Amino acid sequence: MRIEEDLKLGFKDVLIRPKRSTLKSRSDVELERQFTFKHSGQSWSGVPIIAANMDTVGTFSMASALASFDILTAVHKHYSVEEWQAFINNSSADVLKHVMVSTGTSDADFEKTKQILDLNPALNFVCIDVANGYSEHFVQFVAKAREAWPTKTICAGNVVTGEMCEELILSGADIVKVGIGPGSVCTTRVKTGVGYPQLSAVIECADAAHGLGGMIVSDGGCTTPGDVAKAFGGGADFVMLGGMLAGHEESGGRIVEENGEKFMLFYGMSSESAMKRHVGCVAEYRAAEGKTVKLPLRGPVENTARDILGGLRSACTYVGASRLKELTKRTTFIRVQEQENRIFNNL
């Protein structure tokens, strides 16, 4: 046993210090990034935000809607090959370039993903997703995927520390997914006692990944557009959002009615709801590590997407970053004990 005594920080522990700016307007800020990935060699340009691969967020409808904002969607792994074929038949090449194909690590997952990728060469992203990216089996699967799909851009996770981030990149991942327990419907930290404050995880993993020519995506912990800006400021190349994109017309959650008001169900992918839906039950040897919540319907996702992108542009103007690419080097975090004046929050 050992104790690390240096301070670890989440998004709520900091604010970004404003700096002198020469920008005249938020409209002057360029949010598009251009990347060339380490292993695949593929080049990509777009807004580096990703809708999470949850079946109540990462839907085909979400992918179609967010593509118009140049935002990626990690489509959840529970669609069949036939459903993928129908989606591809009805989608433009521009939509498909904003899609990530998600997979687990079983042999069946591998074969299904292979079939999906064979449907259309425009599918260039693979998202290999498990709750615990520290297992040897996971690293081996990433290496297997890299060998099988040498020109596909592979995103793999989740981890929260530099040494594991490096191992995944050396095994073939182009992008490492960072985050254990910060999600809005994740209960891993209270069920297991395991986790890592998200901002510190991003800072540590970004440093490790960039040293090897890899990239990271901050996955979880964002509740406001300001948190998205903090993740980018901390060094994230991409930011993945779940709860902030849930409850919309495109989110795919089941709608329930209570006292005449309609709500949409949103649940974590290790929750009892998810396991009952996709596996049939919660296995005897495990506990659910997610929860289910009812969200008021939030309408089309386009309004939320504009709000997020608007907040991100504004953050850049406050620190004098004319491009999102510059936000990290223009960011100075200050530790705080308050984020906002909450006097009217309950009205």
UniProtKB/Swiss-Prot annotation:
Binding residue positions for K(+): G181, G183
InterPro entries, alphabetized: Aldolase_TIM (IPR013785), GMP_reductase (IPR050139), GMPR (IPR005993), IMP_DH/GMP_Rdtase_CS (IPR015875), IMP_DH_GMPRt (IPR001093)
GO CC terms in record: cytosol; GMP reductase complex
Keywords: Metal-binding, NADP, Oxidoreductase, Potassium
EC number: 1.7.1.7
Catalytic-site annotation from UniProt: C186
Known catalytic reactions: IMP + NH4(+) + NADP(+) = GMP + NADPH + 2 H(+)
SMART domains: IMPDH
Biological processes per GO annotation: purine nucleotide metabolic process
Physiological role: Catalyzes the irreversible NADPH-dependent deamination of GMP to IMP. It functions in the conversion of nucleobase, nucleoside and nucleotide derivatives of G to A nucleotides, and in maintaining the intracellular balance of A and G nucleotides.
Oligomeric form and interacting partners: Homotetramer.
Family per record: Belongs to the IMPDH/GMPR family. GuaC type 1 subfamily.
Protein name: GMP reductase
The organism's taxonomic lineage, starting at the top: Bacteria, Pseudomonadati, Pseudomonadota, Gammaproteobacteria, Enterobacterales
Gene (name only): guaC
